[in-house]
Amino acid sequence: MWPVLWTVVRTYAPYVTFPVAFVVGAVGYHLEWFIRGKDPQPAEEEKSISERREDRKLDELLGKDHTQVVSLKDKLEFAPKAVLNRNRPEKN
């Protein structure tokens, strides 16, 4: 009787193994969930560097007065005076 049973199990091993593995996995999963208990509340995620940078830039923009701008005469002088006028005594 045992040799016949082992021959049948060996022949149909793929069909027997999958349901057994499925049942063992399901029981283990639920047993672990039962032992572990209720999941803790997820911790608050830390902001990414780009999000912190955007927040900082928005805070800087809120603190500025956008009606006060630099005059166009000051903007035309785009290079430092010390570099270009070093050898021109008439402009100093």
From Swiss-Prot:
PANTHER family: SMALL INTEGRAL MEMBRANE PROTEIN 12 (PTHR28599:SF1). This is Small integral membrane protein 12. It is found in: Membrane. GO terms for cellular component: membrane. InterPro entries: UPF0767. It comes from the Eukaryota. Pfam families: UPF0767. The chain crosses the membrane at residues 15-34. Its main location: membrane. Keywords: Membrane, Transmembrane, Transmembrane helix. It comes from Canis lupus familiaris. Belongs to the SMIM12 family. The keyword Transmembrane helix applies. It is a single-pass membrane protein.
